[in-house]
Every structure is written in C-alpha cells, then in structure tokens.
Amino acid sequence: MHMQLSSSIIRDGPQSVLVLAGEIDLATVPECSDMLTKFVDDHAGSDIAVDMRQVTALDDTGVGVILGAVSRARTAGSHLALVIDDQHMRQRFGL
C-alpha cells in the first residue's frame, strides 16, 4: 500500500520548519516539489529547515527534489537545513 505524503509547518524559535511525513517517490514528487517551492518562496531570506525524520521512503527522484529545494533556497538568500536521523538517508545526501 502506498503511503501518502503530508506536511506541516512549525516554528522553532526564529526558524520555520517544514515537517514532511510519508514517502517521497515518483508518485509523490510533484506534490513534494510544490510543498518545498512554496515553503522556500514564502520564507525567502530566512534560515529554514526541512524535517525529514518522518519520511519512510526516499527514492532518487525524491533526493533530486530535496536538493533542488536547497539550491532554490540558496538562490533566494535562505539557508535550508535538512533534519535527518536515518543513517542510510543521510548517506544519500552525503551527510
């Protein structure tokens, strides 16, 4: 059974955090991309984070969309931090 992707935005002090939960794969990448684009654009020039601790699956298309968001944030004058506690997932990002 395919798990949907969900998101919420929380404030952690001065930082806004986009919390992603579920699977980021070929089926959910368009939705994930839209979420990330809106989040980055809405917080341009700020320190922001994407919390991926509740992400249960991540394929290559998902890695690509996350890296695209990091680049978009940098272009917008933001610093985007990834919050990942799964070692395998951290390795996929070279962390």
Residue ranges and their predicted role:
Residues 2-34:
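STAS-typified acidic loop motif
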